[in-house]
């Protein structure tokens, strides 16, 4: 494979190969992109094999591999007793590049410029040693501030300790531990081979978890000096992509709450999610990445739910109303945001005119919340309930009302009340509902309401023919046929041929249709990935077409004097390039926000 053929070659491999190669080419250069494309195509290879397939000299390949390993773009593995080193693709580094702009923007907003600079240095270098970074600073006071920022980022899980096994593929680590355990598990006449293998798997799981959690004890991570707890300066840290994926999940769930419940309740929901975000379950688990370990979808679902339930039992993802009240933004005013039964009753019944002049005192009564707090209620003349609150109107009772609203509803529950006043977030069920909701919205907006009705109908029926669907959705068969064709063309439905005769004559054959979420989501995800890769390729192609002009603008004597030194046609081309790049970047980010839900 030649460098010139790289874009077309990666385009025909798979959507992910196309996107990952495009990102690698933009950030790391053509040689790195070619190596990554080769590893995606052929799997694990040695440096000699990579050189043979890419036509790049071995010395240059090894030099590039060192940089790619440092950037978490490639795993390496050496079998015990062998000198050969195998390399395989690691998508973590490429995904960090994909989200790098959003990562720095988010850290800047919530942690400040200095923290963003630390994260940016980690992203650029792949990983850094804390003492190496701190020693570059001369001012002692500044050093202490930077150490504090490192401690805060580490505590909030934005950066994590990097250990040697992080450079190895999960499958190879598992296989090595499993073979050692199986070898040490003796065969007996009373124990079947199935039971022996199952026992070895359980022991290997324990060893694997212990390996992942090794080096995470407080004595390994922290030092206490003069009564101040700080990170061990000898630690090597890297960016935690899983932590940023949790932030993306929070953003998606808040958008869902906005569309389903409303803006004010969504603001409260956002604060609740941020309260438990750092302790929430990861989107992926090493056991789910090991091929052949968990194959059954039901078993995988049970495993994910068990992780979530364990966090709830440990109170890591549980919050109460008072904790949430302290975290709410000061500019959020919840007064009159809840309509009570008195308001509805007032509007449904005629007003009784009073013989008095209307200056009677309004009745007040005490209500008791689930937190056993007595709160005074004042019934206004319009029937609304005025609840005593603090300065910005965020009383415990009002927050409780909004949480009740979020934990109820006919659709998926955004919160679950486990004990009076204590709530948790059902992440597993919410992510499933989030995918369904966005998929149905996409069908409705792109293919039309009739296609949306047919899709919902098939979800309910599981399987059906044109006539059954037509009777269910109350549309003509011709309309149903046209809409089914559109859904089939978009790979959102599957078709099954049912012959009525042994010769399978077309005149005696009818067709059944079904919708399977997994394959529909997979096709949608691949389409989004391909679209993102196309946008990046278009930007790169347009820049290469005007390479001479861009190099001219980068010259020191031209910078800042473009209007004086460039021709009018060159200025127009430069403006067109900028407009096109901004437009494509906006499109890319919109597609990426949808892709993040289905990845």
Curated annotation (Swiss-Prot):
Region (Leucine-zipper) residue ranges read 528-549
Locations listed in the record? Nucleus
Question: Could you give one GO CC term from the UniProt record?
Answer: RNA polymerase III complex
Keywords on record: DNA-directed RNA polymerase, Nucleus, Transcription, Zinc
Basic and acidic residues: compositionally biased ranges: 359-370
Principal localization reads nucleus
Protein family: Belongs to the RNA polymerase beta chain family.
| Functional note | DNA-dependent RNA polymerase catalyzes the transcription of DNA into RNA using the four ribonucleoside triphosphates as substrates. Specific core component of RNA polymerase III which synthesizes small RNAs, such as 5S rRNA and tRNAs.
Q: What is this protein called?
A: DNA-directed RNA polymerase III subunit RPC3
Q: What is the source species?
A: Scheffersomyces stipitis (strain ATCC 58785 / CBS 6054 / NBRC 10063 / NRRL Y-11545) (Yeast)
């Amino acid at each position: 494979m030649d460098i010139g053929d790289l874009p077309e070659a990666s385009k025909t491999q798979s959507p992910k190969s196309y996107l990952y190669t495009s990102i690698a080419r933009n950030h790391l250069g053509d040689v790195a992109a070619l190596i990554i494309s080769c590893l995606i195509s052929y799997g694990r290879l040695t440096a000699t094999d990579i050189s043979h397939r890419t036509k790049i000299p071995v010395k240059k390949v090894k030099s590039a591999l060192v940089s790619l390993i440092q950037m978490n773009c490639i795993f390496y593995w050496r079998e015990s007793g062998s000198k050969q080193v195998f390399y395989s693709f690691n998508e973590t580094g490429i995904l960090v590049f994909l989200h790098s702009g959003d990562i720095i923007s988010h850290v800047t907003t919530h942690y400040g410029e200095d923290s963003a600079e630390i994260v940016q240095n980690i992203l650029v270098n792949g990983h850094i040693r804390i003492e190496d970074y701190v020693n570059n600073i001369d001012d002692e006071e500044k050093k202490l501030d930077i150490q504090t920022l490192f401690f805060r980022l580490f505590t909030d899980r934005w950066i994590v300790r990097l250990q040697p096994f992080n450079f190895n593929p999960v499958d190879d680590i598992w296989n090595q531990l499993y073979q050692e355990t199986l070898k040490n598990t003796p065969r007996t006449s009373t124990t079947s081979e199935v039971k022996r293998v199952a026992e070895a798997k359980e022991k290997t799981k324990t060893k694997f978890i212990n390996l992942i959690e090794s080096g995470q004890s407080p004595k390994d991570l922290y030092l206490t000096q003069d009564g101040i707890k700080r990170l061990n300066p000898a630690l090597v840290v890297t960016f935690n992509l899983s932590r940023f994926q949790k932030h993306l999940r929070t953003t998606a769930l808040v958008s869902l709450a906005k569309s389903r419940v409303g803006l004010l309740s969504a603001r409260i929901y956002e604060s609740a999610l941020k309260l438990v975000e750092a302790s929430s379950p990861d989107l992926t688990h090493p056991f789910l990445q090991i091929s052949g370990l968990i194959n059954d979808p039901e078993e995988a679902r049970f495993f994910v739910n068990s992780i979530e339930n364990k966090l709830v039992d440990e109170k890591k993802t549980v919050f109460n109303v008072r904790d949430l009240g302290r975290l709410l933004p000061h500019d959020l005013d919840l007064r009159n945001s809840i309509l009570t039964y008195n308001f509805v009753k007032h509007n449904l019944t005629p007003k009784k005119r009073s013989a008095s002049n209307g200056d009677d005192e309004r009745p007040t009564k005490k209500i008791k919340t689930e937190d056993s707090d007595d709160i005074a209620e004042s019934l206004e003349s319009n029937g609304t309930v005025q609840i005593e609150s603090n300065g910005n109107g965020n009383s415990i009772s009002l927050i409780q009302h909004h949480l009740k609203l979020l934990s109820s509803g006919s659709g998926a529950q955004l919160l679950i009340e486990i004990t009076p006043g204590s709530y948790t977030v059902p992440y597993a069920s919410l992510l499933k509902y989030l995918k369904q909701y966005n998929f149905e919205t996409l069908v409705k907006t792109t293919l039309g309401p009739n296609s949306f009705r047919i899709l919902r109908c098939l979800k309910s029926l599981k399987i059906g023919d044109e006539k059954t669907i037509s009777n269910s959705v109350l549309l003509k068969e011709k309309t149903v046929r046209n809409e089914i064709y559109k859904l089939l063309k978009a790979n959102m439905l599957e078709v099954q041929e049912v012959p009525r005769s042994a010769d399978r004559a077309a005149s005696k054959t009818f067709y059944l249709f079904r919708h399977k979420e997994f394959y529909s989501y997979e096709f949608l995800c691949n389409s989004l990935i391909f679209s993102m890769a196309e946008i990046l390729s278009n930007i790169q192609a347009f820049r290469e077409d005007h390479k001479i002009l861009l190099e001219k603008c980068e010259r020191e004597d031209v910078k800042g004097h473009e209007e004086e030194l460039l021709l009018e046609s060159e200025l127009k081309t430069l403006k067109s390039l900028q407009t096109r790049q901004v437009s494509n970047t906006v499109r890319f980010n919109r597609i990426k926000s949808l892709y993040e839900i289905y990845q």
